[in-house]
């Protein structure tokens, strides 16, 4: 199994995902500032993995605070939280994990040393829980995949695999479960412009585990569906609004429209922590815009002439009506049940 975030020898070990697939490298993170930089530069990426990394980042920041006075410590810890919150605005798991760490700090009534110890334990719990969550998502997703006489061919976008979580994955968790049970023939993976997470990361994960994978460009999906090559689409999510609108890597919305046009089921796989019940719908989800160099430059080669303007949103929002079901660790739900009044049933 692939584990992108590991606590070991009093530091955090991150698989450097910017170097994959050509180089497997592990980065040691000792300070909260370094963790913030790792999240911002996408050394670690994927909403659940970012949440785990941010939790450890909170502990690293707490460890750096020298005061033994409780109130002063909590004030300094808030500065660490602000640093980490500023890294990636769309992934709600980041904010959820930071909030959980802060609650741990405020609820601990002992010494500052005890607060720090409890923060580490909470970060480790978030890590372990996410792994269990992803395995449950995989099995719940397997249960609602189309029943066909032949093995399934699935399509995914970006990377919602082990690299994007504590391990196993959300969308790729469903793929892994299908492969484990002998129900998967092949995975089709969108390359996912502009950062090519599908080409670089999803295919790498599949090769590591022997899962048959075919890479296609993003604009080939409609053709593949028309040819009858795809039984279902399974993607992850970085934030889901209360009405079921789901923000995921840019290009997901287009894929959902194409799937709807070809009567191909479209599933979103994500932990309950990704559902933001404070947002009524997807129009309220903040969309990160990244450096346009990701669009116009490959390596040291510039692809465009001078004078061209660029627009580089990292995410788009898929309307709930295009989503067949949202797969969580607690089961699969039609998007319309994810309302504030049904939060208890979902959570």
Swiss-Prot record:
- Protein known as: Methylthioribose-1-phosphate isomerase
Function, as annotated, reads: Catalyzes the interconversion of methylthioribose-1-phosphate (MTR-1-P) into methylthioribulose-1-phosphate (MTRu-1-P).
Q: Does the keyword Transferase apply?
A: no
Output the Gene3D superfamilies linked to this UniProt entry: translation initiation factor eif-2b, domain 1, Translation initiation factor eif-2b, domain 2
Stretches of the chain forming a coiled coil according to its record = none
MF term (GO), any: S-methyl-5-thioribose-1-phosphate isomerase activity
Tell me the organism: Nostoc sp. (strain PCC 7120 / SAG 25.82 / UTEX 2576)
Residues at the site labelled Transition state stabilizer: 158
List UniProt keywords, sorted A-Z. Amino-acid biosynthesis, Isomerase, Methionine biosynthesis
Which lineage do the record's taxonomy fields give for this organism? Bacteria, Bacillati, Cyanobacteriota, Cyanophyceae, Nostocales
